[in-house]
Amino acid sequence: MSNDSWSQMGEMGSSLLQGELQGLWLIPLLALPNAIYIWLWIMPGAWINTTKRATPIFGGSWPSDKTSQGDKACQYLAVLAHTIKMIQAACVVAWFRLYSPDSLTVSGVLAQPAWRIVLGVAGLAFGQCLNVAIYAAIGRNGVYYGSRLGAPLGPWVTGFPFNIPVVGRHPQYTGALLSLWGGVLLTSDDSATAAGFPTIAVLWTIIYIITGIVENTEGHGIVSDHPLRPDGPAAKKAARREKAA
């Protein structure tokens, strides 16, 4: 291979890398809610104190009992999470407008191969189905770490979507990732790929996986801490007390 060919390949690689690096500003914004979730998971008391200080600012009164405090903390977290999600969505749209404006158009999506359109739509549909299902199954407090914050919880749920193998451990995160990769299939044309959108999707996936691993720590997970779990820490503690009595 001639020196000119090597030079051209080097320039192409440098151009691609530069494009990807330029687009990676999106990652910190995408990682923000997961960073908050991990912090909250490890230090739930810190979030309780944060919401306690914030409540008077918004004209509310801080409840005196622990259960109501946990419920208030879940309420604040839900508002924060939805606000961040709207900001994230706006930033993703802005990213495409900057680097690949045609990717989000109907004509751009329909220009994708048929197999990508089918798989992309299926991923988005099933992903959103899981997201809706987990809210319906365990409610706001179940989704937003009520087990860690001491909020009132509904019954222990073993049905859909928790009964799906593998997926059932973290239906919401699985739904988010299915939606993400469905979107990648529908929008990653040449310009979006050159700007690094698949790379961003991989990094975003890793962030979700790390969050899921943290939440799977026995004794600290949303599933493990549920007071009504038949084989959970609360049930085992009650059994030990009964045995000692």
Regions picked out by a protein language model, each given a short descriptive name:
Residues 1-167, 174-245:
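Membrane-anchoring alpha-helices and their flanking helix-loop junctions
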